[in-house]
Design a protein with these regions (language model features):
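Extracellular/periplasmic envelope-modification machinery, especially enzymes
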Residues: 192, 217, 232, 254-257, ...
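Hydrophobic membrane-embedded alpha-helices
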Residues: 2-15, 21-373, 388
Length: 492
């Protein structure tokens, strides 16, 4: 089977649509809307999307530079995700100090654990139940999923680098990744019990890694942008994607958080269904991609990270300000306030920082020393210029984006160089070494990377810029902005 090459990819609006579905399910679940008892499964969709996009980005970076660019990767994750989190934590603590001072200390500890992305383990260690309905919702009880994603972003690139070093062949790596995922699903089932609270099973990094890992496995065989599929393949992809959507809707409408089926097979089936949707969503001209690219879904997906972050503080605090006997009035007010806060955060915090950096966000000018100003974005540009990115986001990744920098200049040796001995074929004088480096066709090509590095000297390990048709340079292909394909997803 030919090796899939992770070429530069363009903005993928269908991934915004997938994010939108995930965050809608989660919000409806936390609003206790009848019929959406399985809405918590939306978090699992974010996990799989994040695993796919993060791994696509890392593979792309390795094919382009020979390394994973870990320093740049981690710095961008921080820039992508932390500003909005800090804003939500500060706003929550201020509101708690005014409205419910008796709970301030407990919220403070939750906020600290969320800031350092260990909230899931803090919840487990403190024996706090995620499913406790009697104590009422807490404003930061949803931060556990962001903690799992950030822990994955920290550990997974290191593990991936080790696997590239030890196994080399992607088929072997895929088997190892799938085996790890199956082990995670087995542990999820083993720790769940109808006789006990299942927060440990539901929020453990080890028990929830399965969805992230299977998303990562897909990235090895199905690039984040499929360039060409024939009519028959497109039909099968649509069958796969539509079946996946149907399966997820069925799970959301029939599953409950106290159901043991959620742990024995529900989350595993959810992951497989999400993989089917992803396969169809990144292929050109599929019906699934068209449906998920509808403008309302795209709009929600772009703001899914903020919606995920803000919805639980709003769910917790709105009843203190809005006294009503109608649950629908409370739900409508909660939704309106959540979307408003998420939109303001996206407009004035998240997007400017993604585009211009922390300091540049104040002046509207890019200040990153390793990036160049990007041309104004538009639909035509967005269709062709970008690179695979992660998500985050709820991942959200929401989170849950592509790189936000223009491709760096390359220094090419001026003297004529005989490439025959290096590349195993004759290169014409107008064929750049960079073109060859971007398409490793076999295992031998990867082994020649050090030789190529002597001819083409990259000044940075960053992938090329992403253009978002609405947000401008730096937007991520699936709704978020940065080098995750749209936050994270991406990214709750």
């Amino acid at each position: 089977m030919p090796r899939p090459t992770h070429h530069e990819t363009s903005y993928l609006p269908a991934l915004d649509g997938l994010r939108a579905l995930a965050v809608i399910f989660v919000v409806l679940y936390h609003l206790d809307v009848p019929g959406f008892g399985g809405g918590l499964l939306g978090v699992g969709m974010f996990f799989t999307l994040s695993g796919f996009l993060i791994t696509s980005l890392l593979i792309f970076t390795r094919e382009r530079t020979g390394g994973l660019g870990l320093k740049t990767f981690w710095l961008r994750r921080a820039r992508r995700l932390m500003p909005a989190v800090i804003l939500v934590l500060v706003a929550t603590l201020i509101t708690a100090a005014i409205a419910v001072p008796k709970n301030f200390l407990s919220y403070l500890w939750e906020a600290i654990s969320a800031l350092f992305y260990v909230n899931n383990w803090y919840t487990i260690a403190s024996s706090t139940s995620y499913f406790d309905r009697f104590g009422g919702p807490t404003p930061l009880s949803h931060m556990w999923s962001l903690s799992i994603e950030e822990q994955f972003y920290l550990v997974w690139p290191l593990l991936l680098a080790l696997m590239f070093l030890v196994f080399k062949r992607r088929a072997v790596m895929t088997v190892v990744i799938v085996a790890l995922a199956l082990g995670s699903f087995w542990l999820l089932d083993a720790l769940a019990s109808p006789a006990f609270d299942n927060t440990r099973a539901y929020e453990g990094t080890d028990t929830r890694a399965g969805g992230l890992l299977l998303g990562a496995a897909l990235a090895f065989w199905w690039p984040a942008r499929k360039r060409q599929v024939n009519h028959t393949q497109r039909c099968w992809l649509d069958v796969l994607g539509l079946t996946g959507i149907g399966a997820i809707v069925y799970l959301v409408l029939t599953t409950h958080d106290n159901s043991m089926g959620l742990y024995t097979w529900g989350l595993a089936l959810l992951t497989v269904a999400t993989l089917g949707i992803l396969a169809a969503a990144v292929a050109p001209d599929t019906l699934v991609a068209t449906l998920l690219s509808l403008p309302p879904l795209r709009w929600i997906g772009e703001r899914s990270y903020g919606i995920y972050l803000w919805h639980m503080p709003v769910v917790a605090f709105v009843p203190l300000a809005v006294r009503t006997d109608s649950p629908w009035v409370g739900a409508i007010v909660t939704l309106a306030v959540t979307v408003l806060l998420a939109s303001l955060s996206w407009r004035f915090i998240e997007n400017p920082i993604r585009k211009y950096g922390f300091a540049g966000a104040l002046t509207g000018r890019r200040t990153d020393p390793d990036t160049a100003p990007a041309a104004p974005a538009g639909d035509a540009v967005a269709a062709d210029v970008s690179a695979p990115a992660d998500d985050a986001g709820i991942i959200v990744l929401p989170d849950l984006a592509l790189a936000d920098a223009a491709p760096p200049p390359r220094t090419v040796v001026e003297e004529p160089v005989d490439l025959t001995g290096v590349l195993g074929r004759t290169a014409s004088t107008d064929e750049t070494a960079g073109d060859v480096a971007e398409e490793p066709a076999d295992e031998a090509a990867e082994e020649r990377t050090p030789a190529l590095a002597m001819i083409v000297l990259d000044h940075t390990d960053e992938p090329p810029a992403t253009r978002h048709p609405d947000a401008g340079p730096g937007a991520e292909p699936d709704g978020s902005e940065d080098d995750a394909e749209q936050p994270d997803t991406d990214e709750p």
